[in-house]
């Protein structure tokens, strides 16, 4: 979430999010941890959704590139030196332990920082901290759409109208440019035109 120190909606925060993302070998995690049952993401949507695209501008940040990750992290440090640890919280009564630990190891080894998993005993404890905005670290998240449409992913998870406990935007991400794209998509006269706006919104998220 953007309320964490060093991860605001600014140049430093963008650089650090990109660096962390490019530190993770999603392909290996999908193969070794999920035994081939998961697919590395190239989009914020599932493949059957009409707005899904493998060609989004900026989606290179979703690809494993440790040398670029180190470069971006160094640029962020030039703005504000990193200190402390990077943690990813998860509920220990679920199935996230192995993949969260794997991701933390990638981040630790690539960026040479203290990165660790943070288990919370139960789903209730975990969700209570997420819903109340009390998380003091990054945390695992998941989403199952109610219906197969881009808005049920993007509006629910990233639009300002779904922040502050009003929807699935638990990280309280707020970006007027993104919101404007969602408004245009929702009022578009055709699916094809709506999908173009959804994709432009996703490209904002990838920045």
Residue ranges and their predicted role:
Residues 31-35, 43-44, 99-101, 150-153:
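Short, solvent-exposed loop/turn and secondary-structure capping segments
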Residues 74-145, 170:
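Ligand/substrate-recognition segments at binding pockets and active sites
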